[in-house]
């Protein structure tokens, strides 16, 4: 979902001086982390961190990682698969913009994808971790669209703290689809699963 590396630059406040890993080390770490799962990875999204380096230095981190994992990459994609002959389309993009409130983040997500037809929409930019659904009337009866913010692993502090943004604990989302094409989700929050690892109280 993007932002796989810190990609600090001297043009972005003091990020270059606060980075804890070199970009080379980050690339090695990301590639080695995902290699055991490479057969299940079909696409990598560019995030705003990767796009920053591409813009400033003409360095495409996502391409380097995708080539190492032998998968496609880009800004956004729609992937499809079948569950009992029903086609499920999944739209994914890193996303853009920020919001202090979950309800304004949800409305922006819907608005930004209104011209895209899919069953499941995935977005990661705003660091939230949640899933919501909207019933859609069709000639075949009610269908559902599922929207998911996929979470993040960035601790609270620095920019978030100075802007008084809400604390969004590190989290990830597990989506599942059963044989009857029912989409369910489970969220794993660090403050509920491993509170001792949190960087703030």
Specify the residue positions occupied by each region the protein language model found.
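A general structural motif
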Residues: 39-41, 87-88, 117-118
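Conserved beta-sheet core of the metallophosphoesterase superfamily
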Residues: 90, 96-185
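Core dinuclear metal-dependent hydrolase active-site scaffold
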Residues: 78-98
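C-terminal accessory extensions appended to soluble enzyme cores
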Residues: 19, 171-201
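Core catalytic region of metal-dependent phosphoesterases/phosphodiesterases
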Residues: 1-73
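Active-site glycine-rich loop that binds ribose-phosphate moieties when present
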Residues: 67, 73-79, 99-108
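Active-site glycine-centered loops adjacent to acidic/histidine catalytic or metal-binding residues
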Residues: 3, 47, 94, 124-125
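Short acidic-hydrophobic surface loop/beta-edge motif
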Residues: 76-85, 133-139
């Amino acid at each position: 979902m993007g932002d796989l590396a810190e990609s600090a630059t001297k043009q972005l406040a003091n990020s270059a001086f606060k980075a804890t890993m070199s970009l080379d080390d980050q690339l090695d770490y990301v590639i080695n982390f995902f290699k055991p799962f490479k057969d299940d990875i079909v696409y990598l999204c560019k995030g705003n961190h990767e796009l920053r380096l591409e813009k400033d230095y003409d360095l495409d981190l996502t391409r380097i990682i995708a080539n190492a994992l032998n998968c496609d990459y880009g800004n956004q994609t729609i992937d499809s698969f079948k569950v009992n002959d029903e086609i499920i389309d999944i739209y994914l993009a890193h996303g853009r913009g920020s919001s202090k409130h979950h309800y304004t983040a949800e409305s922006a997500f819907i608005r930004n994808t209104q011209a895209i037809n899919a069953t499941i929409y995935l977005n990661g930019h705003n660091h939230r971790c949640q899933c919501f659904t909207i019933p859609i009337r069709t000639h075949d009866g009610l269908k559902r669209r599922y929207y998911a913010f996929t979470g993040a692993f960035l601790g609270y502090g620095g920019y978030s703290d100075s802007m008084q943004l809400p604390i969004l604990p590190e989290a990830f989302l597990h989506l599942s689809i059963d044989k009857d094409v029912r989409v369910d989700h489970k969220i794993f929050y660090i403050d509920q699963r491993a509170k001792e690892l949190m960087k703030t109280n």
